[in-house]
């Protein structure tokens, strides 16, 4: 045998428009990015998404709920369908819940026990107004967390960030109270825009 053999990179998929960092995460993980499709109104067509997952067999499937930038949320039943579809192709479903506190939908964290291929990422940047601290967290099956521990950067979280997060959690009731006001104002603006056409 002569020459160099190459093999195709694994695939990751996300349904655009969505959070712009997901393709970069795929690139860092050495997987090819594929733009999945949404409807013309930017809502996620779960039936079409399940078909795309079955056809492409992605190693990583990204969804964001509520979606950034559209604000639309995905129901827990739709996420469950995506979890089943990704499990069928031995893939992981990464559910970005950065804006979860602004949604009335049930969290995908409730699916992890039954669907170990579901990973849920969250951040303190949004609801806790903690963007400058750059602190996020992941909820996943223990096996997934153990695997991630093997590749995480050492000293990835400073003592100052940890201390600031502890203080924020002590005041979470006050900080999260602002979320309801923001959500209420958002709904008023959305209703006014809808009325204007």
Could you tell me what each predicted segment is?
Residues 13-31, 154-155:
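Substrate-binding/gating loop at the entrance of the active-site cleft, primarily
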Residues 7, 61, 96-98, 121, ...:
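Structural scaffold positions in well-ordered secondary structure
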Residues 16, 35-40, 97, 122:
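Short beta->alpha connector loops at strand-helix junctions that form conserved
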Residues 117-194:
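PLP-dependent aminotransferase class I/II
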Residues 33-37, 60-67, 93-97:
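Short beta-strands and strand-loop turn motifs
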Residues 2-9:
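Short, small-residue-biased leader/transition segments that mark boundaries at the very start
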Residues 44-56, 69-127:
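Active-site pre-lysine segment of PLP-dependent enzymes
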């Amino acid at each position: 045998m002569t020459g160099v053999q190459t093999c195709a990179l694994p695939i990751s998929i996300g349904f655009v428009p969505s959070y712009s960092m997901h393709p970069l995460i795929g690139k860092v993980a050495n997987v090819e990015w594929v733009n999945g499709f949404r409807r013309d109104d930017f809502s996620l067509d779960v039936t079409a998404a399940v078909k795309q997952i079955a056809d492409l067999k992605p190693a990583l499937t990204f969804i964001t709920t509520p979606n950034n930038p559209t604000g639309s949320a995905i129901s827990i039943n739709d996420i469950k369908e995506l979890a089943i579809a990704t499990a069928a192709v031995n893939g992981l479903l990464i559910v970005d819940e950065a804006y979860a506190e602004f949604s009335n939908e049930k969290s995908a964290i409730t699916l992890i026990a039954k669907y170990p291929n579901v990973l849920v990422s969250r951040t303190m940047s949004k609801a806790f107004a903690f963007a400058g601290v750059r602190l996020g967290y992941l909820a996943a099956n223990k096996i997934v967390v153990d695997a991630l521990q093997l590749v995480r950067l050492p000293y990835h979280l400073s003592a100052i960030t940890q201390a600031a997060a502890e203080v924020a959690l002590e005041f979470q009731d006050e900080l999260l109270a602002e979320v309801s006001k923001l959500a209420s104002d958002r709904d008023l603006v959305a209703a006014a825009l809808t009325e204007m056409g």
